[in-house]
Amino acid sequence: RKFATKRYQTSIKPTLNYTSDFHKEIKSIVSELNLPKSFSCFHIRRGDKVGEKLYTWTQKTGRTESKRFEFCDYLKHCEDIKTIFIMTDDFRCIQEALEYISDNNLPHKILHLTNESQDGHSETLNIQNARSYSREELVQFFAEIEIAKLSDVFVGTRTSNVYKYIMNTCTTNTKFVSLD
């Protein structure tokens, strides 16, 4: 298991503090999910980092930044935990997970905050279009981060900034598993 050291948690904590209103919104979202005592969290990357969306790095080098991992790659690290929260910005990940569970007749339950209009991230397109994120999108993102910190097992890719941030700010006994 990898945990953030108390010293590092102390040094990073002042870096980002939620306002009381923002924190209330996050708590409300987490509460509405009715998370069970035991659940796993999968951070599934899609979009530009795995070559599915426009990305300058891929155009220049011909390589993606990260390997694309499938739902089953995540699941094999915590098959005994029957409730899974999926963090993603691409609704297709949710659909793929539900199809896998159905096709394999598994008893797992999927929870998520991703909506059907979310189709993955493209940093290049976001810069070209001067995209900014709404408060609602930011609340959703940080709610996902707080949910991840509550999980028994967090499965993701250590090359992701999201993985690094969660691991370095987590103060619970969450087990971290990296696929890369």
What is the predicted role of each segment?
Residues 1-81:
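Secretory-pathway luminal glycosyltransferase catalytic domains
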Residues 43-45, 49, 81-133:
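Catalytic donor nucleotide-activated moiety binding site of glycosyltransferases and closely related
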Residues 52-55, 94-100, 165-168:
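A short acidic (Asp/Glu
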Residues 56-60, 100-103, 171-173:
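Short secondary-structure boundary/capping segments
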Residues 61-64, 131-135:
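Short, flexible loop segments at the rims of nucleotide/cofactor-binding pockets, characterized by
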Residues 80-84, 151-154:
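Short active-site oxyanion
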Residues 141-180:
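A donor-sugar binding/catalytic signature common to diverse glycosyltransferases
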